[in-house]
């Protein structure tokens, strides 16, 4: 099926995040609602999104209910449908790529909705099969970009954390965790009490239910407390007398390989992110990674993006 000739580079991260969140799961074959015209289908979708009506969205898009339910625990998957509706209310165009297919163009940035409309007989419906792969590819790209951005911010977050001793200690050290243990300030994020200073990760996670969340934009994160021979300065431990003083590093791994991400990422205090495809068992492989060690099997993440110069339809 011919797609409209519209290049949408990864740089348009914010706009893409806003518009992709109403479609966050793999599509499944289920009974779908059809419509007399593409315009009728488009407005039904917008109305369902505006009402945050999961049943209506499932009927229109053909998702099964089990896939829709996954939206609650991950802020990257959570449905911020009000923003989607706002963008569609500003700009909604229907571009017919053939007599039997059409695409929705949404928002001021002319975002091409990933699920096309197709005509069967005299009725139109969203082609969820055609949209599934495109949606997955876009979601993976966005999740990976967001993960790289978080890791690039890690040096600033850790320096902010290290400015003062924490939890009654007289030692200034880096955080050993991303999320603090309940009742402690041993991580980059904690629930700030009334009048208490916000945690370094507070601004980034202000709209996230950190008690329910198990990942962030499809990735899990873990601090690394040592580095290997391939790291600048060679192998050594960052821990001194139980405190993370000699440096810091982190590892990020996709929750579901091939669905929420493909590449795994590492970073240290210099903020340069490296990537590697750990394969379908990324989560198991990652469990044995104890040190920051960007050897020749890892590549610079941003360099790969520049080289590939990816575009989205």
Question: Which role does the model predict for each range below?
Answer:
Residues 1-9:
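N-terminal secretory signal peptides that target proteins for export/translocation
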Residues 11-25:
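Bacterial N-terminal signal peptides
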Residues 27-47, 131-156, 160:
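Short, low-complexity N-terminal intrinsically disordered segments enriched in polar/charged residues
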Residues 53-65, 171-173, 178:
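Short, well-ordered alpha-helical segments enriched in acidic and aromatic residues
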Residues 65-113, 210-217, 222, 227-230, ...:
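Surface-exposed, charged secondary-structure patches
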Residues 161-261:
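Flexible, glycine-rich surface segments
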Residues 246-300, 311-312:
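C-terminal soluble interaction/assembly domains
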